[in-house]
Amino acid sequence: MAGAIASRMSFSSLKRKQPKTFTVRIVTMDAEMEFNCEMKWKGKDLFDLVCRTLGLRETWFFGLQYTIKDTVAWLKMDKKVLDHDVSKEEPVTFHFLAKFYPENAEEELVQEITQHLFFLQVKKQILDEKIYCPPEASVLLASYAVQAKYGDYDPSVHKRGFLAQEELLPKRVINLYQMTPEMWEERITAWYAEHRGRARDEAEMEYLKIAQDLEMYGVNYFAIRNKKGTELLLGVDALGLHIYDPENRLTPKISFPWNEIRNISYSDKEFTIKPLDKKIDVFKFNSSKLRVNKLILQLCIGNHDLFMRRRKADSLEVQQMKAQAREEKARKQMERQRLAREKQMREEAERTRDELERRLLQMKEEATMANEALMRSEETADLLAEKAQITEEEAKLLAQKAAEAEQEMQRIKATAIRTEEEKRLMEQKVLEAEVLALKMAEESERRAKEADQLKQDLQEAREAERRAKQKLLEIATKPTYPPMNPIPAPLPPDIPSFSLIGDSLSFDFKDTDMKRLSMEIEKEKVEYMEKSKHLQEQLNELKTEIEALKLKERETALDILHNENSDRGGSSKHNTIKKLTLQSAKSRVAFFEEL
């Protein structure tokens, strides 16, 4: 009895010591994972576990997203997971997504896994039409997506229809034109073929470099009202805060870069923005829900922090990551070059093999022809020899007949003819015998000449037979494989060798020399756009090519706005924001209040 009680106590003790857990499902852009989490875990514990599992070190761009009553929310790092307003049914589901976007993907995204996750997310946003993308740019982006998935274009492998099951273009773009899937595939493939030699990470980065210049890239939109009650849209992104007309999400009416904002706070549904210049009055707006204000503040804090970080020297961790990325890139470049060399050598060997097979077949044909010529020569020689023998026998026979005729003539001459009639008759016979003898002599001479000619022809035929045998012998003894020229080894590649105080809902931004740094960033953007001149020409060419197939009645409001901007010689997103910030902050605040 005592033993049973002790056993139950021991089991209860073990049960109490065993940590209680709950199941979490994490959904990324291309996978799902499940984890057992302890009840006491905070958001940071779960977030760090996911990042370690993915091998992700650039954690500052990402977050765990969930939905509360149709409103997006993000897991807070310092709050217990189960203290969030999430479903208590297991598994608790979160989406691992990019929360903040870089200003320049090529400069800021270091790890390949980071680039890949951004690529998948931005691609989905474009296909789901959460980011507006013009038709011609959609085709170009699709070609890079195909390069990332399939590698280099190979006509023997990527035959017509190989993209039939792929989702590559927004449905809006497909419905806008009278074009068959085959016509779209043809245009995508034409660009896809030009991307030869780009690895998956390079193709994905080219995709992001184009996508980041789209007007709606990286912008979170929120419905707000100003003091006058005018319905507007607030856009929060990596560059600052932007105010939009609800009917036009492409071009902001006003912009406030992060370097002009000193403090952001909210009370209930009212949001307050304090400009850096204290002489300028604050401006306020109202959102629809308190929960939305919390989200806006989170995005403002995170984007401002990254805005500041970009304009400072890289931390030691980032420097190490960039160094490792450079080494990895150099290693992959060497590997690609090695594979390219091997592929080149293999193709060269295959070409040499094909050439040898072709030459061998040619030599076999030549040998067959030589054999046939030899056989014909032998047959001709046999026929000539036989004909010469017959002619020689005929000549002998004629000579014998001529001798007999001569003897007959002599016999007749020796015979005495007594009567005149017999004499005349004999003279006639003698004359006939002489004519016959003359003809026999001429025929004999002709036959003799013909025999000589046949002997000469026989000699020539035997000479031709000898030459044919000699050529056949040369073909038989000729080397089958010609010497191969060594492939020169390529030269070795160059190897490059806001803080939140307590629980207050306010955030102060520190002053810094932001304008100068912003100008430097803008300068880099301008240089990038200059390099993209050829790309823009290609886009314009495709736009012109498919314009005749457009169904105008199917254009959306954003299509019309984009076309109007283009017709006015619309500039890039960054240039548009720069123009909007040329006015003083005071005048922009006043303009916002009067909207």
From Swiss-Prot:
Q: Where in the cell is it found?
A: Cell membrane; Cell projection; Cytoplasm, Cytoskeleton; Nucleus
* Membrane-crossing segments per the record: none
Instruction: Choose one Gene Ontology CC annotation of this protein and give it.
Output: early endosome
Q: Where is the FERM domain?
A: 22-311
Keyword Nucleus found: yes
Describe how it is modified after translation.
Phosphorylation of Ser-518 inhibits nuclear localization by disrupting the intramolecular association of the FERM domain with the C-terminal tail.
- Self-association and partners: Interacts with NHERF1, HGS and AGAP2. Interacts with SGSM3. Interacts (via FERM domain) with MPP1. Interacts with LAYN and WWC1. Interacts with the CUL4A-RBX1-DDB1-VprBP/DCAF1 E3 ubiquitin-protein ligase complex. The unphosphorylated form interacts (via FERM domain) with VPRBP/DCAF1. Interacts (via FERM domain) with NOP53; the interaction is direct. Interacts with SCHIP1; the interaction is direct.
| Name the record gives this protein | Merlin
